[in-house]
Amino acid sequence: MKGAGGPDGAPKALLARALYDNHPDCSDELAFCRGDILTILEQDVPESEGWWTCLLHGRQGLAPANRLQILEEAPADGPCPPFFGGLEEAPGRSQENYEVPSPPTPGPVYEQMKSWVEGPPPPTVQIYEFPDPPTCARIVCEKTLSFPKQAIFTIPRAARTSLPALPCQVYDVPAQSRCPPASKEPGKQQLYDIPPSRQKATLGPLSSQANGQNVPLTSATALRRGGCNTLPNPQKSEWIYDTPVSLEKAGVQKASLANSGEELGHRGLPRYMSSFHSPPNSIARSHPPHPQKNGPMQKKLSLPEIPCYSFPPPKCMFPLDESVSYKVPSSFLIPRVEQQNTTPNIYDVPRAMPDVPQAGKELGKAGGPSENSVDHSSSWFCSRAASLSPEPDSISVSSSDSRASVLSSCSSTSTDSSSSSFSEEAAKELPLDLDSAKETVTALQHKVASSVSSLMHFVSRKWRFRDSLEANIDAIRRATDRIEESLREFLDFAHGVRGTAGNLTDSNLQTKIRDQLQTIANAYQILLETKERLESCGWSLEVLATDKVQNSPDDLERFVLVARTVPEDIKRFASIVIANGRLLFKSNCEKEEPVQWTPNAEFKLARRIQLPQKEGESYQRKAPFQKQRASEQPPELIEKNKTNACGQNPGSLIPRPLSQQNPEKRIHLSEHCRLYFGALLKAIGVLNGSLSNRQPPETFITQSKLIIMVGQKLVDTLCKETQERDFRNEILCGSSHLCSLLRNLALATKHAVLEYPSPAALGHLQAEARKLEQHTQQFRGTLE
């Protein structure tokens, strides 16, 4: 079947409307979008059952038959007067049913649609203009099973849903061939009056509005709701669009909402129509009315003021008390899908917030741990909100909303709001030195792990049976309280660490701390939420005891599942703090040490003054012997000693410490430190050998990395094993210089690789390696 035969026997092409989008899988398949009108060339394709050969936009290909709907042929072309006569002869028809002349049959060569507009059509032929497909809708004549008469559908393009589309049953007619309305029905409104261009429809006043025309919905909304909403004869077209106003006039919102409901009744403006030509920040805000001197409307129409008649209002809404000012974050002002069809509200709040007042009342009535949990959560996430908003109502709303927003997985806006409130809570810096910070984080980590293990002790295969749960319910309840308390203490410390990390320039470390803290905080919120629900039911055995395998976890199971993952998250955060302890707590350590050493300052000052006098007396005694010994040495050795003495870096001259002055306080290096010293010296020797043999860059890059890694391990081990303050300061001084030499080695390696085979760059790398080797030997000799 290659087409349908007409009355004269000539084949006519069938038209079909696309029901779904089609993305081609091969070059022979035809791509089309939902609503496109295709011309069926052949329905019986050999060896391709269920596929039709179609034509779209001058391109021929195969299309799946189950995605197309054959349209009945439109009536033959005719002049405009008979068309209007048909409307007059059938007054019983609804105003939405029109007969449309069939479009001309496309030729073998695709003709640009612009040619239809450039040449004015003859005055005798009244054919409606078919606009360009990307910007306007297509007109389709279709027979349906439910309606025996012909109906007109305006099918929108999916890529143009944000633009003001043409209304249903309204067509754009060229100005030269526009026909007057029917004379027999003067009471009817003008049928075809739409701006011919997009610029005119956007900027100028609508001519249809001046004549009392209906303001159309977009075609997608018209198909869904099945009718057109109207506006009460606006005087200016700019009244349709929402415009931002100053915030000082926001106090009259309640009166404006009541007036808009009385004036408009059941009619409403689509929520998204006012967003076409208004700034994004004004979409979710309310605006006061602007009185006009003349005209039936005394106020501008704004987005939140017009009710939508199609959907009932929600059951739970906030009581808009004028004495309470709610602090709504800016991220909540973005309109969401679930709030597109609700009654007007001054504040665009998340979906979870309407349940907050009722939950607050229940928690207020309950006693014991429930109240504690509420206080903990509010102190955690809303301490800053409490200082900004003194009203107790706003504090409770924001605290409860922060808990609900963290748990909401269906709203990205609520999750963003929780993270933003997290960032706004700027934690203070921890006044701790490195040792105290490590001890604190280790103790808090152990406390959390032990509290979680006390709960896991009761979890077994039969722990939810009534007999087992009845015997252990009190202990399980106490274990959940300990988990909440220990995790809250750890979060206090973690917030302080984050505040300390905010002063660093290392963005990677800040990101690690922030992400890991967010993970722990999310787990804490889930534990709080589930524990509150368990407290609300009173830990009833009738609710918690079960002998069956549950398909979905209840509150107690969810608490256990989340608590099981907390120790691992705590361990990761503690590892980050311990590994980067010097960066985080270096400034605090430097500030505290002079205060702690103040009582011994006079003693040390006197000791530093007396030591040079003793050394001067010993030098006077030993001077003749040293001169005699120096005269006996060969001149080459004397010159070498002078060169070494002048070439030494002053920072590398570490004095013989208290290990020689006081033998009782001799430093005893552990086996690990000795191994690291030996490995570092050996790695430096291997690097020097590679540079002497002119090895390729790949070789000495690996060897340089090994030196840096071993050097870092050595410094960490020395700082951990040295606990006495006197020795610790000397070791920190030598370790700091060792780290600077390791950094210089890394920079020299990078420069040598980039400039390879430059002899100067390789020589500089060799010099840095020799400096590092010399300082390592001196450092080791000082400690032993």
UniProtKB/Swiss-Prot annotation:
SUPFAM superfamilies: SH3-domain (SSF50044). Residues 11-73 form the SH3 domain. InterPro entries: CAS_C (IPR021901), CAS_fam (IPR037362), CASS4_SH3 (IPR035744), Serine_rich_dom (IPR014928), Serine_rich_sf (IPR038319), SH3-like_dom_sf (IPR036028), SH3_domain (IPR001452). Keywords: Cell adhesion, Cell junction, Coiled coil, Cytoplasm, Cytoskeleton, Phosphoprotein, SH3 domain. Residues 343-376, 614-635 are annotated as: Disordered. Phosphorylated on tyrosines by SRC. The keyword Phosphoprotein applies. It holds the Pfam family Serine_rich. Residues 466-536 form a coiled coil. GO terms for biological process: cell adhesion; cell migration; cell surface receptor protein tyrosine kinase signaling pathway; positive regulation of cell migration; positive regulation of protein tyrosine kinase activity; positive regulation of substrate adhesion-dependent cell spreading. The modification Phosphoserine is found at S197, S246, S302, S373, S387. GO terms for cellular component: cytoplasm; cytoskeleton; focal adhesion. The keyword Cytoplasm applies. It is found in: Cytoplasm, Cytoskeleton; Cell junction, Focal adhesion. Transmembrane segments: none annotated. Its main location: cytoplasm. It comes from the Eukaryota. Belongs to the CAS family. The SH3 domain interacts with the C-terminal region of PTK2/FAK1. Interacts (via SH3 domain) with PTK2/FAK1 (via C-terminus). Docking protein that plays a role in tyrosine kinase-based signaling related to cell adhesion and cell spreading. Regulates PTK2/FAK1 activity, focal adhesion integrity, and cell spreading. PANTHER family: CAS SCAFFOLDING PROTEIN, CAS SCAFFOLDING PROTEIN FAMILY MEMBER 4. This is Cas scaffolding protein family member 4. It comes from Sus scrofa. The gene is CASS4.
